[in-house]
Amino acid sequence: MNIQCLSFINCYTTCLLYTSRTDMRKSIDGLCAIIQEQFSMEIDHALFLFCGRKCDRIKAILKEPDGIVMIYKRLTAQGSYRWPRNKSEVRNLTWREFDWLMSGIDIEQPKAIKAT
């Protein structure tokens, strides 16, 4: 999954990452409940990313005009996502950080990568 594969997402203004471990058995309703009940946020106009105990799979939800979409990705190789686990929070990501995360790059790197 990279930003090119999900080109339809760029119309969403915000990419938000839930840093705490998520029970990956949760459905759309369960993931929406995390956002609405723990953080008093609505899911409109944002892509929300979730990761479980194993960092080899993620879920994402986003709201469209006619419903809510859930995307699930499990890495098939030995790789894993470098998911920030500071505390239970929703963290705002730039689209560049989203692309780094999907590419396996740590988004909490001490030095920024220079744009080419």
Model-derived segments and their meaning:
Residues Y18-T19:
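Conserved small/polar residues in nucleotide/adenosyl-binding loops
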Residues R85-T116:
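C-terminal low-complexity, charged extensions that often adopt amphipathic alpha-helices
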Residues I61, P65-R82:
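Compact nucleic-acid interaction/catalytic patches
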Residues T22-D23:
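Domain-level signal for Mg2+-assisted phosphodiester chemistry and nucleotide/NA-binding surfaces
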Residues K26, A60-I61:
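Mobile genetic element proteins and their domesticated derivatives, centered on retroelements
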